[in-house]
Amino acid sequence: MCTDMAKKASAKQAEPMKLFYIFYNQERWDNWIKTLEEANFEPAEGEEVSEGEQMLFSFTEDITLSVLKIVRLYQNGRFTKEETIAKLDDVELIVMTGLPEGDLEEIIGSLQLSLLVLFTACRKYLDGEFDKDIKALVKKGKGIDEENLEEALEVAANIGAAVVDGATCCAKYIKDNVEDPGLFDEWLIEIETMSNAMKSLAKFDEEPGESS
């Protein structure tokens, strides 16, 4: 009897703990859009980067960190693969659906394009089928014609999955193209943001019932 109870208790402890954690919601997205609408995207005199560009980078970091928190908790055994995918879907629906009207339409459209690699890489990581030879992958990606979007994204997502798994990328591969980056370079820039986010989440974990 006691042995059976111990086995049941042990099995229960082995199950991923369920969390009441809000990773990203529509209100958070809307607040960022409102802030960006009020920002000035023209650099002040003597400045190279405008207030709006700085905010846009922080916006990207916020989304990237929120998404990778989900994956990090999966790595910690807090979520099953199915739960992780469902939570990624929820955030992706907010981030990748629709565009604001006016001046921000093109800016947010470009942001959404760069964030394609974030969500695709996370799913590839969860599937577990990805190459870890970063150097070879970058070389392959840079050789793909920009019109071949799907193939380029597949390679970039492979790099991103390797980064989520612990590989380091991609500062040394983007420094030469930072002034005029192509789409694959934009994805490498986002993967660099992912790399930094994963480092910051090295000790991240949440207890059941905690919220953001």
Give, region by region, the residue ranges found by the protein language model.
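Alpha-helical oligomerization segments
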Residues: V155-S212
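Amphipathic protein-protein interaction modules
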Residues: L116, I134-I174
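Short alpha-helical "patches" and their helix-cap loops
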Residues: D127-G143, E207-E210
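Residue-level detector of alpha-helical secondary structure
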Residues: I33, T64, L68-V71, I85, ...
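Extended alpha-helical scaffolding modules
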Residues: Q13-N25, D30, L36, G109, ...
